[in-house]
């Protein structure tokens, strides 16, 4: 599963708009949009926040 697919899945599970998801990750709406469309690679800091968010909401990709 790509990061784009994981991002869309987590956002769907949490029922968040791209705007609200961006706020939770500390990035812009445009960044979330590019990440979900596979046009960008997440920074290490974004990946850490994403992992923390998944852990906080008991979302696993195992």
Report each predicted region and the residues it spans.
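A detector for short, charged/polar N-terminal pre-domain segments
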Residues: 1-2
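DNA major-groove recognition helix of helix-turn-helix/homeodomain DNA-binding modules
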Residues: 44-62
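Short alpha-helical DNA-recognition segment
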Residues: 15-33
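Short basic helix-loop element that most often maps to the first helix and adjoining turn
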Residues: 5-20, 49, 57
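Solvent-exposed, flexible loop/coil residues
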Residues: 5-7, 33, 45
